[in-house]
């Protein structure tokens, strides 16, 4: 109780045994020890200093927690949503959604984020995994990231981040906690930017099963020119079900929660797809989502 009192005195919201299904887009997941919501970056830093055994959660759009109790703490960045312009850079707190960044940039006439519109994640999560869509990657726009390494706050420039396809230094070094992300500014025309964003969203709605809970595309593209969704469709798994989990009939690269799926249903589906793809194509798949 002393720890909880300390967290509350810092100004956090604190929830005991909070179910993760309430906080992730898959709508799956059992309880964690403590679920903590800081309201400012300073509060976030102070909270990190009094907690151990912590996972950081952004918008929860790329995470599959297990069904059972998870004996660790989760800090949510959902309230860390500041955004402003300084020295020709858009600076965003890590919990800001990509959607809000895109809308802010479009309103200000800043181009370069159009293809990110509709990616259902936070700015911090996008930097963490170098999120992307339609040929665009987060790394293209990043100038710097402010991180906490457990001792001090550091500013890393883009050359230090080891960006590659769905990967970065932050995935390799979990001790680096993302606080803020600085994006470069490319001047454009608001009308044209909004028009392009509308086209991107239409494409998403047409091709992706947005009407069902999911964590987006489950698997990384293993090599250039190999499209996982098409490969899954070719081996006849489109629409295949395990428990409440199903390979989307709209886009086979998505596993959806169509009927109160358990985490184990999704995990079993992932392993089945990996096995079938390897047997049919000799390709080893890696997951794009984080499995807790």
From Swiss-Prot:
It catalyses: UDP-N-acetyl-alpha-D-muramate + NADP(+) = UDP-N-acetyl-3-O-(1-carboxyvinyl)-alpha-D-glucosamine + NADPH + H(+). GO terms for biological process: cell division; cell wall organization; peptidoglycan biosynthetic process; regulation of cell shape. Its cofactor is FAD. It comes from the Bacteria. Pathway: Cell wall biogenesis; peptidoglycan biosynthesis. GO terms for cellular component: cytosol. Residues 27-188 form the FAD-binding PCMH-type domain. Keywords: Cell cycle, Cell division, Cell shape, Cell wall biogenesis/degradation, Cytoplasm, FAD, Flavoprotein, NADP, Oxidoreductase, Peptidoglycan synthesis. It holds the Pfam family MurB_C. Its EC number is 1.3.1.98. The active site is at 166, 217 (proton donor), 288. It is found in: Cytoplasm. GO terms for molecular function: FAD binding; UDP-N-acetylmuramate dehydrogenase activity. Gene3D superfamilies: 3.30.465.10, UDP-N-acetylenolpyruvoylglucosamine reductase, C-terminal domain, Uridine Diphospho-n-acetylenolpyruvylglucosamine Reductase, domain 2. InterPro entries: FAD-bd_PCMH (IPR016166), FAD-bd_PCMH-like_sf (IPR036318), FAD-bd_PCMH_sub1 (IPR016167), FAD-bd_PCMH_sub2 (IPR016169), MurB (IPR003170), MurB_C (IPR011601), MurB_C_sf (IPR036635), Oxid_FAD_bind_N (IPR006094). It is an enzyme of class 1 (oxidoreductase). HAMAP family: MurB. Belongs to the MurB family. NCBIfam families: murB (TIGR00179), PRK13905.1 (NF010480). Cell wall formation. This is UDP-N-acetylenolpyruvoylglucosamine reductase. It comes from Thermosipho melanesiensis (strain DSM 12029 / CIP 104789 / BI429).
